[in-house]
Amino acid sequence: PIKGYDVLVARLESLGYRQPTADSPGNLVPMPYDWRLSNRFTAAWMAPTIQRELERWRAQGGRYADAQVVFVCHSMGGLVARRYAAAHGADHVRKIVTFGTPMRGSMNAVDQLANGAPWKLGPLRGLVTDLSRSLPSLHQLLPSYACVVPDSGGELTHLDPGGIPHGDPAMVADGLAFHTEVEAAETTDPTFAAKVHAIVGTNQPTQSTVRFTGGGTEF
């Protein structure tokens, strides 16, 4: 089971989807993953399982012979699915359905790197802060859009890999490159935009810009 998603899986099974077994193919394949790791790694790790189960399903023949993959993703899982399609399987991905995926990154990632974990964590704050700053996945959640308010005013600028307080420039650059790679691959597929179905919330307070100051950050 995938903790927190049991109800969704049960609902899909009630609609007739079934998980594969050793003896029978299935068309519902839960993919829990280690969210701390790079989304590049996770997409590559998923590929053999997805492609194996897709081939088993297609082997039934008939109307299943041309089956394709539909991803149902929450939060960062949508970035993993986009990376999978871009690097491993655009030809057999039919849809990517996402719930609350930060497609172009999240200002929360900047906050975590620059300011650390919340103070309410008490004595665990330092440990959680150090852990967060070591995660490739957190850096791949950094905003890819122009989000920095310059001191002089004027147009917003993109994040500078060396400009985030307490950030590792190499890890920041790698995280930003993740978005560049995925977006570049997607632009070569004129059908890709129609494959993504993003379900989002409205009227939710969301930080979208940051100003770096001598004393820290202003969101």
Model-predicted segments: where are they?
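N-terminal non-catalytic accessory region
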Residues: 1-135, 139-143, 149-159, 201, ...
